């Protein structure tokens, strides 16, 4: 062997040895914490993530659920040299999510801030981890979600939900398969665009196809970015280019809409105190529009994607729950009757529908959970956890544990009935505390109006072969597109022709 090759081999071995030593030392602080065996020294638990059987509808949260059941309320997760801790006790959820002392972990939110080199959510309301900067934004944004502002949005909720139902009625022949996931996504984008930004996207009418495709590709990109090696793989170049172009298109749409609003304000036109107005106020005096666009993207994506998936999961589950559907239809008939416009007061009277939507979020939360950074060593449920550790809190995991919910995989809306005990710090589909979702009341009103109108006038049946699993992109969504055949309420088959 030549001296050069020998020197190169020695350098590689030395680098590998140093790498192994670094990984070992980084993990040694956590070895006392319960957790599954590592299938790979360098990769840690990463191979488990790859074997989660997503084709069968299992997602990463199902892996974490298995570990929480087996190893207890504090579980160690190793990926390369990094360690996170899954926490699944109500006491710890209360302690860490309800206190302003514990911030989001910036390392865990980088995948949302920038995707393959393109700024996506940046320093928007969801991904901003500095409490001071976040609080400044949140204080201004809260004005767009006051009770009076939300009540004023009922007109938009009704208008777009009515348009959705009319389109579905035209397809309700009992035979034509309809992707409810796609239709509900179009509806929630149209609602969000008008309610939050004063814009008509007309997705339900087939307009804005480039924007619709860009949103789809961008969401796939967030999922793809979790593969740290993707940007180095030649076969991924086309996909990465499309992801970057989609993000640029989405931010350009934001620039255009912001410019239109600014021009309208200069002309002295009256503008609603909507989300776009508050975004402009929050960044008044800023040197550039980057953070403003961060919040545009944040509200545009988070404001429609989670609601669309919540509705799609609910339709999917109700397709196999005829008794629950009958109760829902009876309630809608009593509260809403035949009127086409739901009033704000109607929403509070749709008690059973509220229970169904809550139970849907328990089993199928689009936003599965959140992270907090533990800055100092702390005893958590009797386990010493070192400082500078990301803590993972999952409403998906806790919502499916029989420790907290009886028969957790059974869809039972009566868990949330008036006389039922309230789940305390085991159910948090909108997170908890000061970092809870700013738009949760908006979302709950929106999905209630849409579901009430669907139940009032449409019967849906899942096409055979559709699976009840999940997939993970930026959020959790149904594995299949929730293909349904539709019929108008009260539809009866035509009588057979008389015999000749």
UniProtKB/Swiss-Prot annotation:
Compartment(s): Endoplasmic reticulum membrane; Microsome membrane; Postsynapse; Presynapse
Q: Which cofactor does it need?
A: heme
Q: Name one GO molecular function term.
A: testosterone 16-beta-hydroxylase activity
Which pathway does this chain act in?
Steroid metabolism; cholesterol degradation; Lipid metabolism; C21-steroid hormone metabolism
Q: Does the keyword Membrane apply?
A: yes
Q: Which PANTHER family match?
A: CHOLESTEROL 24-HYDROXYLASE, CYTOCHROME P450 FAMILY 46 SUBFAMILY A
Name the UniProt record assigns to this protein: Cholesterol 24-hydroxylase
Per the UniProt record, the source organism is: Mus musculus
- Gene symbol? Cyp46a1
């Amino acid at each position: 062997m030549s001296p050069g090759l020998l020197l190169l081999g020695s350098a590689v071995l030395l680098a590998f040895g140093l790498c192994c030593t670094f990984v070992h030392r980084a993990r040694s602080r956590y070895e006392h914490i319960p957790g599954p065996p590592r299938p790979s020294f360098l990769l840690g638990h990463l191979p488990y993530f790859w074997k989660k059987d997503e084709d069968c509808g299992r997602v990463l949260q199902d892996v974490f659920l298995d570990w929480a059941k087996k190893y207890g309320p504090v579980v160690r997760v190793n990926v390369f040299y990094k360690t996170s801790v899954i926490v699944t006790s109500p006491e710890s959820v209360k302690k860490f999510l309800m206190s302003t002392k514990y911030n989001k972990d910036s390392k865990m939110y980088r995948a949302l801030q920038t995707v393959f080199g393109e700024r996506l959510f940046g320093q928007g309301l969801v991904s901003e981890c500095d409490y001071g900067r976040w609080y400044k934004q949140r204080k201004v944004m809260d004005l767009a979600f006051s009770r009076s502002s939300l009540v004023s949005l009922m007109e938009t909720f009704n208008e777009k939900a009515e348009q959705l139902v009319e389109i579905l009625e035209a397809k309700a022949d009992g035979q034509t398969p309809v992707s409810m996931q796609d239709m509900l996504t179009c509806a929630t984008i149209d609602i969000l665009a008008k309610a939050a930004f004063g814009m008509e996207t007309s997705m339900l009418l087939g307009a804005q196809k480039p924007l619709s495709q860009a949103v789809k590709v961008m969401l796939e990109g967030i999922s793809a970015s979790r593969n740290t090696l993707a940007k180095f793989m030649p076969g991924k170049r086309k996909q990465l280019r499309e992801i970057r172009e989609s993000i640029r298109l989405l931010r350009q749409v934001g620039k255009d809409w912001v410019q239109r609003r600014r021009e309208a304000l200069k002309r002295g036109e009256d503008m609603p105190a909507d989300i776009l107005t508050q975004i402009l106020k929050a960044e008044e005096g800023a040197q550039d529009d980057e953070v403003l666009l961060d919040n545009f993207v944040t509200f545009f994506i988070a404001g429609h994607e989670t609601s669309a998936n919540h509705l799609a999961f609910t339709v999917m589950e109700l397709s196999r729950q005829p008794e629950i559907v009958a109760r829902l239809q009876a309630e809608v008939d009593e509260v809403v009757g035949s009127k086409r416009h739901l009033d704000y007061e109607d929403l509070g009277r749709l008690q059973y529908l509220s229970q169904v939507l809550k139970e849907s979020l328990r089993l199928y939360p689009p936003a599965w959970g959140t992270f907090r950074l533990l800055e100092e060593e702390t005893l958590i449920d009797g386990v010493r956890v070192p400082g500078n550790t990301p803590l993972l809190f999952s409403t998906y995991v806790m919502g499916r544990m029989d420790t907290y919910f009886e028969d957790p995989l059974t869809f039972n809306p009566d868990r949330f009935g008036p006389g039922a005990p309230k789940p305390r710090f085991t159910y948090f589909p909108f997170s908890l505390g000061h970092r809870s979702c700013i738009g949760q009341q908006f979302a709950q009103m929106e999905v209630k109006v849409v579901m009430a109108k669907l139940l009032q006038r449409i019967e849906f049946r899942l096409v055979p072969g559709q699976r009840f699993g999940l997939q993970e992109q930026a959020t959790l969504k149904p594995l299949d597109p929730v293909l349904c055949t539709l019929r108008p309420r009260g539809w009866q088959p035509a009588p057979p022709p008389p015999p000749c």
